[in-house]
């Protein structure tokens, strides 16, 4: 029973982590305006502030993953939760855009809570239940994503965005305490000197493992397209309602409703992957999300944009559980922490590239072109994963 207690504590912890993230990060463009950045330069600073954290997190991912395998996954989860809480606290005391940039760089250094938690869960549950529990973990993140924008929009209206950062810090420090007290890492074989190697060796192994490399590329492309969209949502909604008045509340409501739709379908995709194969689930979910993003470029009203957001959410929530389960199946247990560390690096690098691409697109084209490009990229990724599926029927 203790192992299941550990799993559920981690799943609940990911809910609070996601809540803290989505109650603040999507609204950073508004915080930049509050800090005095001009409307003309907010696109540039949005791209820099978003991407800086992901660049640093991408560099640190293999380091934290290796330390998870050598020094303990729980220790890495505690480290990440505590330091992320510190980064949010720093976000509440910044006074200009340069200080906010420094806060995001530190946040990128602290990153790794989800990767460490997923590594613990995948090492704890039986393989036959892997898809289900990874689906539960993804559902928890989605539910946090639902509550976060509601809380972020409400808190920014009631106490302002600055004080909202302190609330987020409290969330992460409570998560730290819960992991320390309740989570038990499963016993594993002692680390052998023969298993030691450099991070370059880990990267070479990932490149030589064809299935793992394909999955890492999928993490990268998927996250890049998601993060092309995230920084522009509030600005796009402001265009659709022809005003930036109360845009935080409107955007929070739409993103949360989309999250509710996604939460209802996550476990379905996890079970489909277990029964029909994870590659099949990956192809179906990425295709549906790509079509949905293309359609999102069409609406000229808030209502229909929200409907399209719900459609995208229903599909995109099913991608990561299947990617995570497939990653577990194609890597040995002794490499599990590093595998999730590398997947975290791929996601963070995608997260870094995405906002920069969207910022560049908006310099020369309307915002809706970001949605068109993201949809095309996802459809191409789905086709590539289908080609990989033809040679990897075991997954």
Please report, for each region that a protein language model flagged, where it lies by residue.
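Central cavity-lining transmembrane alpha-helices of secondary-active solute carriers
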Residues: 48-64, 256-265
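Structural signature of the two symmetry-related core transmembrane helices
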Residues: 75-90, 169, 280-295, 375
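Conserved MFS/SLC helix-loop-helix module at the cytosolic interface between two early adjacent transmembrane helices
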Residues: 58-95, 273-276
């Amino acid at each position: 029973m203790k192992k299941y207690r550990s799993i559920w504590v981690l799943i609940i912890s990911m809910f609070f982590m996601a809540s803290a993230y989505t109650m603040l990060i999507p609204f950073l463009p508004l915080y930049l305006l509050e800090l005095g950045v001009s409307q003309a330069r907010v696109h540039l600073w949005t791209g820099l502030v978003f991407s800086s954290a992901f660049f640093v997190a991408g560099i640190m991912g293999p380091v934290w993953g290796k330390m998870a395998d050598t020094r303990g996954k729980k220790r890495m989860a505690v480290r990440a939760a505590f330091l992320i809480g510190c980064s949010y606290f720093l976000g509440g005391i910044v006074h200009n855009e340069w200080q906010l940039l420094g806060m995001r760089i530190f946040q990128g250094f602290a990153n790794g809570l989800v990767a460490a938690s997923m590594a613990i869960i995948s090492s704890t549950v039986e393989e036959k239940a892997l898809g289900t529990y990874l689906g539960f973990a993804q559902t928890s993140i989605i539910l946090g994503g639902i509550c976060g924008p509601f809380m972020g929009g409400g808190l920014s209206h009631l106490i302002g965005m600055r004080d909202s950062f302190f609330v987020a810090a409290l969330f992460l420090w409570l998560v730290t305490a819960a992991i320390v007290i309740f989570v038990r890492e499963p016993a594993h074989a002692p680390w052998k000197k023969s298993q030691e190697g450099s991070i370059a060796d880990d990267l070479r192994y990932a490149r030589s493992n064809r299935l793992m490399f394909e999955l890492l590329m999928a993490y990268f492309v998927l996250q890049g397209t998601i993060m092309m969209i995230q920084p522009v949502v509030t600005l796009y909604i402001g265009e659709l309602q022809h005003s930036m008045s109360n845009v935080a509340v409107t955007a929070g409501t739409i993103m949360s409703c989309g999250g509710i739709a996604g939460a209802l379908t996550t476990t379905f995709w996890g079970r489909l992957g277990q029964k029909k194969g994870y590659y099949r689930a990956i192809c179906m979910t990425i295709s549906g999300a790509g079509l949905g993003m293309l359609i999102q470029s069409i609406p000229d009203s808030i209502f229909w944009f929200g409907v399209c957001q719900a459609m995208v959410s229903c599909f995109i929530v099913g991608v990561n559980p299947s990617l995570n389960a497939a990653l577990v199946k194609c890597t040995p247990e002794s490499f599990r922490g590093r595998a999730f560390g590398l997947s975290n690096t791929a996601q963070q690098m995608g997260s870094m590239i995405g906002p920069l691409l969207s910022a560049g697109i908006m310099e020369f084209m309307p915002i809706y072109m970001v949605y068109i490009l993201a949809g095309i990229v996802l459809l191409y990724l789905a086709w590539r994963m289908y080609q990989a599926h033809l040679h990897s029927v075991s997954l």
